[in-house]
C-alpha cells in the first residue's frame, strides 16, 4: 500500500490592508506599518469635546505646525506596542539586576555621608521633573494626530514614569527603605534654591497649549540639556569622587537618552523639511525655551557639576540643533 501526499501552494489574494497598499504599494507590510498608519478616525466625529469645543477630537489645528500628512513623521526605532514592550523588558531586566546587586550589598549606604547627601540633594529630586515629563508627553499624545506621532509620545511618557520610579528607588536605597529620603527630596524640589529654576520651567510647561511647542520645550530642549548634564557629567563627577557604584543605577537613563534622541531628531527634521513656515515657527519657539532651560539649570549645575559642565553640554546641544536644521542662541 502506498500513500501519495500532494502539496498545494496557496497564494494570498491580498498582500496587505487597503490603506497600506495605497501608501506603500501592493506588498507585505511590516508590523510597524500595520500598527501605526491610519488608526484614528478622521471623519464623522460624534461630538466636539466638551472641554475644548473649538476643536474636533483629532484636530490638526491644535498646533501651529502644518503638515500635509502627519504620518510622514515616523519612528526610526520602528516601535509599535509589541516591539516597545519587548525592548523595555530587556532593558528593565538588566536594570533590576543592578538594583538588586546594589541593594543586597548595601552599596549606597556605604558611600561617604557627604556623597550620600549630594546624591539626595542633586539627583533624587529629579523624580519630580520626570513626573512632569510624563504629564507633558501624555498631554502631547492626547492632542497630537497620527498614531506614528502619538505612540512615540505615549511610550516616552511611560519611560519617564519608570525613570522617576528608579530615582525613587535610589532614594530608598539611601535611607534603607524608610521613605525619609523621598520626603527630603520633595522638600528640596519645593524649597531648595538650586531646584526652583527647573521647577518653574516644568510647571510653566504644563500650560503650553500648542502640543508641538510643548514637545520642543520638553523632549528637545530640556531633555537635551538636563539628561547629559545629570546622567553623563554628574555621573562622571560621582565616579571621580568615589561614587562609581551609582553609575549602574543610572545606566537605564543613559541608554534611554541615546535611543530617545533618534526619534526626537527625526521628527524635527521631517517637520522642518515640510515648509518654511514650520522652520520659522520652530526656530522662534527654540529662541524662547532654550535660554530659559539654560538659566533654569544654572543653579543645579553649579552645585552638582560646575557651570563649565553645563556650558559644554550646551555647546554639544548647539551642534545637535545644527544637524537638525535649527540654530542655538548659544552660537
UniProtKB/Swiss-Prot annotation:
InterPro entries given in the database record: Ferritin-like_SF, MP_mOase_hydro, Phenol_Hydrox, RNR-like
Pathway it works in: Aromatic compound metabolism; phenol degradation
Gene Ontology molecular function, alphabetical: phenol 2-monooxygenase activity
Entry annotated with the keyword Ribosomal protein: no
Keywords from the named record: Aromatic hydrocarbons catabolism, Monooxygenase, NAD, Oxidoreductase, Plasmid
Entries under Pfam families matching the protein: Phenol_Hydrox
Top class in the EC scheme: oxidoreductase
Catalyzed chemical reaction(s): phenol + NADH + O2 + H(+) = catechol + NAD(+) + H2O
Enzyme Commission identifier(s): 1.14.13.244
Coiled-coil stretches: none
CC terms in the record's Gene Ontology section: extrachromosomal circular DNA
Record entry for activity regulation: Requires DmpM for efficient turnover. The activity of DmpLNO oxygenase is inhibited by dithiothreitol (DTT) by a mechanism apparently involving H(2)O(2) generation.
Consequences of knocking out this gene: Cells lacking this gene cannot grow on phenol.
A single BP term in Gene Ontology: aerobic phenol-containing compound catabolic process
Family indicated by similarity: Belongs to the TmoE/XamoE family.
Subunit structure: The multicomponent enzyme phenol hydroxylase is formed by DmpL (P1 component), DmpM (P2 component), DmpN (P3 component), DmpO (P4 component) and DmpP (P5 component). The oxygenase component is a dimer composed of three subunits, DmpL, DmpN and DmpO (DmpLNO). DmpL interacts with the auxiliary protein DmpK (P0 component).
Biological role stated in the UniProt entry: Part of a multicomponent enzyme which catalyzes the degradation of phenol and some of its methylated derivatives. DmpL, DmpN and DmpO form the oxygenase component of the complex. Required for growth on phenol and for in vitro phenol hydroxylase activity.
Protein name: Phenol 2-monooxygenase, oxygenase component DmpL
Origin species: Pseudomonas sp. (strain CF600)
Lineage start: Bacteria, Pseudomonadati, Pseudomonadota
Protein's gene: dmpL
Amino acid at each position: 500500500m502506498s500513500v501519495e501526499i500532494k502539496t498545494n501552494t496557496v497564494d494570498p489574494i491580498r498582500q496587505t490592508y487597503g490603506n497600506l497598499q495605497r501608501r506603500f504599494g501592493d506588498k507585505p507590510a511590516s508590523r510597524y506599518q500595520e500598527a501605526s498608519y491610519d488608526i484614528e478616525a478622521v471623519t464623522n466625529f460624534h461630538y466636539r469635546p466638551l472641554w475644548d469645543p473649538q476643536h474636533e477630537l483629532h484636530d490638526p489645528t491644535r498646533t501651529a505646525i502644518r503638515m500635509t500628512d502627519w504620518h510622514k513623521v515616523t519612528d526610526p526605532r520602528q516601535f509599535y506596542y509589541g516591539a516597545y514592550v519587548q525592548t523595555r523588558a530587556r532593558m528593565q531586566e538588566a536594570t533590576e539586576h543592578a538594583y538588586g546587586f546594589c541593594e543586597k550589598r548595601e552599596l549606597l549606604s556605604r558611600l561617604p555621608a557627604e556623597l550620600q547627601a549630594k546624591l539626595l540633594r542633586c539627583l533624587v529630586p529629579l523624580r519630580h521633573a520626570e513626573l512632569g515629563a510624563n504629564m507633558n508627553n501624555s498631554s502631547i499624545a492626547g492632542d497630537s494626530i497620527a498614531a506614528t506621532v502619538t505612540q512615540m509620545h505615549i511610550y516616552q511618557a511611560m519611560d519617564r514614569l519608570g525613570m522617576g520610579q528608579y530615582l525613587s528607588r535610589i532614594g530608598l536605597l539611601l535611607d534603607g527603605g524608610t521613605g525619609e529620603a523621598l520626603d527630603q527630596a520633595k522638600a528640596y524640589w519645593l524649597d531648595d534654591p538650586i531646584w526652583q529654576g527647573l521647577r518653574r520651567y516644568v510647571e510653566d510647561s504644563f500650560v503650553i497649549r500648542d502640543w508641538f511647542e510643548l514637545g520642543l520645550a520638553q523632549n528637545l530642549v530640556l531633555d537635551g540639556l538636563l539628561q547629559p548634564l545629570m546622567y553623563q557629567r554628574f555621573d562622571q563627577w560621582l565616579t571621580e569622587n568615589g561614587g562609581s557604584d551609582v553609575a549602574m543605577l543610572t545606566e537605564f537613563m543613559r541608554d534611554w537618552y541615546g535611543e530617545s534622541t533618534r526619534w526626537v531628531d527625526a521628527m524635527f527634521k521631517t517637520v522642518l523639511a515640510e515648509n518654511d513656515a514650520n522652520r520659522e515657527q520652530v526656530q522662534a519657539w527654540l529662541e524662547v525655551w532654550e535660554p530659559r532651560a539654560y538659566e533654569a539649570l544654572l543653579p543645579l549645575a553649579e552645585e552638582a557639576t560646575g557651570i563649565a559642565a553645563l556650558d559644554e553640554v550646551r555647546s554639544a546641544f548647539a551642534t545637535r540643533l545644527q544637524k537638525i536644521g535649527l540654530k542655538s542662541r548659544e552660537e
